[in-house]
């Protein structure tokens, strides 16, 4: 478990061999109204269960309510989770190193106005948090501590490989819509999301098989637990595209990276040949991820 980033910058390319999660507390308190989180989908379920166990640090007279209870709206994910940006200190660990990462913070409806000014100090941060700075910092520490304990307490890592199924399917819907737009005014032979969908199907099958295996695993069996943990940890790292150079395109993550190899790039381009190549490479990246999650590559039977 890692909480500091500066001493680790020289190890980013091999950090997935040294750590299994990165939790960032940079800028953890800049307001008091909302909780916002940027994270790998592997950590979504863990965060939700953790927030149900941590009391709201401010309370507003409602003693006993958890942070989860205080989230406004019915849709927890929509209210709390937001895309991870490049300026987030957790971003390179996710998009460059392929480590499940999470950034957690208390914010206000308006952005914190004092960054980079002489007013960026404890006094004005107190104003921004309505003098609840200590309580909010304590709450943030409790969330981070609970996350760490839940990750290391059990013999099997609490990474939810199922959650990526939903995320990947959402991307397929967007890409299919894009392909319809591109092919509307002419034929584009071979330009189809068929194989991409098959690769996502392979991932879904691998995730379901792992869940079944978890139900039948003796958690006192160290070797079995190690094997399962190793397969879960391969998911994030294998979503780093192997078809671009880390030197030229450092943020190689298929979903969270930047460059022509990403899912997002497929929604922007007009060149059909380039799009066909992007689809093929994305398919192979996802299939490789599915194969890694499945375990022994010699036991895998697929046609891609």
Predicted segments, located by residue:
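Secretory-pathway/membrane protein signature
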Residues: 1-304
């Amino acid at each position: 478990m890692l909480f500091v980033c500066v001493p680790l910058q020289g190890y980013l390319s091999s950090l997935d061999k040294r750590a299994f999660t990165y939790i960032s507390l940079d800028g953890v308190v800049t307001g008091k109204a909302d909780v916002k989180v940027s994270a790998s989908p592997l950590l979504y379920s863990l965060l939700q269960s953790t927030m149900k166990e941590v009391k709201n640090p401010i309370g507003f007279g409602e003693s006993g309510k958890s942070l989860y209870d205080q989230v406004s709206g019915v849709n927890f994910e929509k209210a709390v989770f937001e895309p991870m940006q490049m300026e987030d200190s957790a971003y390179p660990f996710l998009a460059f190193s392929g480590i499940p990462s999470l950034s957690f913070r208390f914010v206000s409806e308006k952005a914190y106005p004092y960054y980079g000014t002489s007013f960026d100090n404890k006094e004005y941060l107190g104003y921004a948090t309505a003098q609840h700075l200590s309580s909010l910092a304590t709450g943030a520490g409790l969330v981070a501590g609970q996350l760490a304990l839940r990750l290391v307490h059990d013999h099997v890592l609490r990474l939810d490989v199922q959650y990526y199924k939903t995320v990947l399917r959402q991307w397929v819907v967007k890409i299919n819509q894009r392909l319809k737009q591109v092919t509307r005014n002419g034929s584009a032979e071979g330009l189809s999301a068929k194989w991409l969908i098959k690769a996502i199907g392979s991932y879904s099958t691998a995730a379901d098989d792992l869940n079944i295996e978890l139900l039948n695993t003796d958690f006192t069996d160290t070797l079995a637990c190690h094997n399962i943990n190793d397969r879960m940890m391969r998911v994030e790292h294998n979503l780093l595209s192997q078809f671009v150079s880390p030197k030229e395109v450092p943020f190689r993550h298929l979903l969270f990276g930047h460059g022509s190899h990403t899912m997002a790039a497929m929604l922007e381009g007009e060149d059909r040949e380039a799009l066909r190549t992007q689809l093929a490479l994305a398919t192979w990246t996802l299939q490789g991820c599915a194969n890694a999650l499945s375990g022994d590559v010699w036991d895998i039977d697929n046609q891609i």
